[in-house]
Amino acid sequence: GRPSARYDAPYCSQEEVRECQDDCSGNAVRDSCLCAYDPAGSPACECRCVEPWRR
């Protein structure tokens, strides 16, 4: 499968990923963090909480 976004998205700063992980760690269900870069949208890193198996 595709490597996790944390490694293959050079646009996501370590700080952003860490912040997202902090946010998600308190989430009972979606406690994994998925950071993705959307080339079609703004050049921003988008992080969201996901279920661990959906990473």
UniProtKB/Swiss-Prot annotation:
Keywords: Disulfide bond, Ion channel impairing toxin, Neurotoxin, Secreted, Toxin. It is found in: Secreted. Contains 4 disulfide bonds. One of its GO terms (cellular component) is extracellular region. Its main location: secreted. Residues 1-5 form a propeptide. Expressed by the venom duct. GO terms for molecular function: ion channel regulator activity; toxin activity. Probable neurotoxin with unknown target. Possibly targets ion channels. The cysteine framework is XXII (C-C-C-C-C-C-C-C). This is Conotoxin Cal22d.
